[in-house]
Amino acid sequence: MTEEKLDTNSFRFFGLGGSNEVGRSCHILQYKGKTVMLDAGVHPAHQGIASLPFYDEFDLSQVEVLLISHFHLDHAASLPYVMQRTNFQGRVFMTHPTKAIYRWLLSDFVKVTNIGNDNAGGVSDENLYTDEDLAESFDRIETVDYHSTIDVNGIKFTAYHAGHVLGAAMFQVEIAGLRILFTGDYSRELDRHLNSAEIPTLPSDILIVESTFGTATHEPRTSKEKKLTQLIHTTVSKGGRVLLPVFALGRAQEIMLILDEYWSQHAEQLGNGQVPIFYASNLARKCMSVFQTYVNMMNDKIRKKFRDSQTNPFIFKNISYLKNLDEFQDFGPSVMLASPGMLQNGLSRDLLEKWCPDEKNLVLITGYSVEGTMAKFLMLEPETIPSINNSDVSIPRRCQVEEISFAAHVDFRENLEFVEKIGAPNIILVHGESNPMGRLKSALLSNFSSLKGTEDEVRVYNPRNCVAVDLEFKGVKIAKAVGNIVDEMLPVVDEDKERPYNDPEDATSEEQPKEEPQDADKLPEEREQPEVEEERVISGILVSDEKNFDLNLVSLSDLREHHTDLSTTVLKERQTVHVDCRNELIFWHLCQMFGDIEVLVDEEGATLTKVEEDEKNTKPGQLVVRVMGDIKLSVVDHVATLEWTQNVISDAVADSIVAILLSVDSSPASVKRSSHSCNSNDHPGESETLWKIKQIAKLFNEQFGDSFTLLLDKESEHSDNENIKGSVTIGKNYATVNFSKMAVEDCNSNPLKGRIESILGIGADLVAPLC
């Protein structure tokens, strides 16, 4: 594949094998910089390097996770090659039964797989991989349980029952919220020992589904079993031999369950053991022990039989095992299940060449036959077949050939039903020959034609090998607030504080009984949440987790706690300015400009609030204040020192303070405040401050009428006016106003408090001098 940068919002599917063909299944998924490989098989119709997927077309070092759906050779046989002979460095996962069978199956495969395949029939001495490669790769394989989710650097995947063979799994892969379901080979039919394929609980955005049988429909299971047993019974009754080419594991066990039961039920008709059944495979006994071990992972029927009879259902009464043909005495009728299922080589091919000239014999194909294999060729009923030892030698074929598919693959009806239940808007077809796959694509598009042109339109793709499918996904990015910043974001939900301000005319009305909320019986997280204030700015740090694709909004103080891999550095600014004025004048200018002034130390050195350790033992004449909550100003001996945490807002405020300090001694406002002028009011003997307070009180009388009271007595009129207050009472809402400080000191209603502060601001502007 040509190396090109994939857009971060684009998902790419790239088939290295198994696209528009059956065999060498291998698919690449790429999204958000993550790469997943699905399966690593070989093509049963080819040998050596030619049987491998097109690994040279992709840089396997990019693959982080490789998922093996099941143990069949066309899905798993090139895994040791990938792990030991390429630059692959990722992690490999499969289910427990798959790993248990994998080693035995591939040990046998090593013996018959060679690099190269010349037209003359010669075979090279070098294999695709060695037993040492297989052993080393085996130790690196990790197992996964059904329904458990594993997270590898942000790639999450969950295994589900696929129903194809023991241990077969469908994988739902999730990357940055995008879910891809890969079915592998799957079956929705409940057979004698396996569960049918499951429907994942979470929806999928992309479905990668097999299309082995295209639009074909299977016979009912009971009909197939009856036809199978009748054909075999008829053949052996005539003295013939029956060859059933099967894969060593999978459908072979299903057919053995059928035949063992039939032989027990028809023992007399079959000569009470005179017609033997053999299972010929080098791996027979080894792999059958795996089936006997994992009975509890099979369906309820087989588990019940195991519990009730206390005997393992895979210990057969009427079936014997053959390791090789040297142990087989070929006298009279018999039934032979032999591997491999494609008749390319091995025991099944040897028996085919031995039995095919006899017209009494029967070859019964029970699985799917791949193009280019002897099994597929035999279904054409040729007059002769080539010998495996010498292709120039032709062997006459007179035996009967029948096909009864027990392949654990979905037919069109089952596939369509599954696709509809998954409901994925994007479907990618794999594991199917071009013609059946093309017919399936047309049938699916026709089925979903009513959705074309809508937001729910279903798109179906059937790419060839090494042809990429790019899909655009623009997901919504949601940041999760974590830590202390949550408190800032939550609206005030206290009912009293949220109660709107009532008009004075309604103050005497009786309070209505409070109704219980309709969702009082619900959990807090299920209740309807109060609306959050709009246009409210929340400051924090947005942290993106590249591994898990999570976005977290945290405050600076929480950064280390919630993201231990991040370090923080706080930059403090300090600036010194010489001033030639009194501290009181500086404080007055700061109050006029900013209002929000926290006095830490006054001019006499007395602490007004809790003083930090470094601020104790202050000198007389020192002034220490905090402006806007962040900027600390210390004035000692006509030297002003500012300290603040560096950020955009604090920098701007600090610049404003410096400007005030540099101009405070020459400001007209400073001159006026420092001089002792006559009162500007018309009431001799009354201070200017008291006059201003009374003017502002008039505004309160206009706004609140009798609900407002100015707390002013004769002693206050002649005092220094440092603590003149007023009160506002409206129904159950009340507020205390300190006119000396121009602030609301005590209020139980936010709306009322806001209104009073607004009136105070207007009053301050009205009584302020024009200069």
UniProtKB/Swiss-Prot annotation:
Chain spans, region Disordered: 493-533
Localization in the cell: Nucleus
Presence of the UniProt keyword Nucleus in the record: yes
Signal peptide start and end residues: none
Biased composition (Basic and acidic residues): 511-530
Classification via InterPro entries: Beta_Casp, CPSF73-100_C, MBL, Metallo-B-lactamas, RibonucZ/Hydroxyglut_hydro, RMMBL
Binding site for Zn(2+) 1: H70, H72, H164, D185
Record-level Gene Ontology MF annotations: 5'-3' RNA exonuclease activity; metal ion binding; RNA binding; RNA endonuclease activity
Annotated Pfam families: Beta-Casp (PF10996), CPSF73-100_C (PF11718), Lactamase_B_6 (PF16661), RMMBL (PF07521)
UniProt: Zn(2+) 2 binding residues: D74, H75, D185, H431
Chief place of localization: nucleus
EC number of this enzyme: 3.1.27.-
Keyword hit for Phosphoprotein: no
GO cellular component entries: mRNA cleavage and polyadenylation specificity factor complex
Keywords per UniProt: Endonuclease, Hydrolase, Metal-binding, mRNA processing, Nuclease, Nucleus, Zinc
Active site: H409 (proton donor)
Family: Belongs to the metallo-beta-lactamase superfamily. RNA-metabolizing metallo-beta-lactamase-like family. CPSF2/YSH1 subfamily.
Function: Component of the cleavage factor I (CF I) involved in pre-mRNA 3'-end processing.
Record-given protein name: Endoribonuclease YSH1
Native source organism of the sequence: Eremothecium gossypii (strain ATCC 10895 / CBS 109.51 / FGSC 9923 / NRRL Y-1056)
Primary gene name: YSH1
